[in-house]
């Protein structure tokens, strides 16, 4: 079975990070939350992660242009996977896809039905 749709139960600091990184790697991701208030707390975390990822890509892009050694964040891939502006563009596209492919939901039943894999990241 090929996993395509991942559900992360919980959108706190850890859940948001798991969800964004999973979406960055190309999966469709839904974050299941318990309340409207949780949505309001999760959205800024996701926006922050989006901005952090873009800033990291910009840093790598500047190093590439300057001919400096490249140090990619671990979740971005191996340093030798970025050799050109086209590779940088692919990273930017992955961040945009991640943002687009993240969904927030309050409907646990629907999330469970659609999920190929569920990751639990809820407060105890």
Positions of the model-derived regions?
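A short, basic/flexible loop-to-alpha-helix module at the beginning of a structural domain
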Residues: 1-4, 109
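Hydrophobic Val/Ile/Leu positions in short beta-strands of Rossmann-like dinucleotide-binding domains
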Residues: 7-8
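Glycine-rich Rossmann-fold phosphate-binding loop(s) that bind the pyrophosphate
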Residues: 11-12
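N-terminal Rossmann-fold NAD(P) dinucleotide-binding loop
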Residues: 15-16
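Aromatic pocket-lining residues of Rossmann-like dinucleotide-binding sites
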Residues: 22
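Short beta-strand element of Class I
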Residues: 29
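Rossmann-like NAD(P)-binding element
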Residues: 34-41, 52-124
